[in-house]
């Protein structure tokens, strides 16, 4: 279930909540893992912006859509949310448990 910690500039979502948001449209999904991790399987439609490039590539982040960050377990994506917030973005979400939880819940990945 969605969880917003007032100390964090993002909302934590379960993989199922993310899938629902994606089905409704109007979201940008960003996978912040390394190239080899992304190539081994990622959330369908996710754009690839490695966490160490998020600040430099902030102009690629949507200012008019919800942005969902995902990594392997949710730590690097939380850092990416922090970077996006520092760039002035506010509609930020982190996939709780990352791609591992996405797969564990039975959602498909693409390669």
Which sequence ranges carry the predicted segments?
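Rhodanese-like catalytic fold shared by cysteine-dependent sulfurtransferases
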Residues: 1-28, 35-66, 75-111
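Short, surface-exposed ligand- or partner-binding patches at beta-edge/loop junctions that are enriched
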Residues: 70
């Amino acid at each position: 279930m969605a969880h917003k910690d007032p100390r964090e500039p993002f909302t934590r979502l379960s993989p199922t909540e993310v899938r629902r948001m994606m089905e409704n449209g109007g979201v940008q999904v960003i996978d912040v893992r390394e190239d080899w991790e992304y190539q081994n399987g990622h959330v369908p439609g996710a754009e690839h912006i490695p966490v160490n490039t998020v600040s430099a590539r902030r102009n690629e982040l949507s200012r008019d859509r919800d942005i969902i960050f995902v990594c392997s377990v949710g730590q690097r994506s939380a850092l990416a949310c922090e970077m996006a917030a520092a760039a002035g973005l506010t509609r930020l979400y982190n996939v709780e448990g990352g791609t591992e939880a996405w797969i564990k819940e039975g959602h498909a990945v693409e390669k």
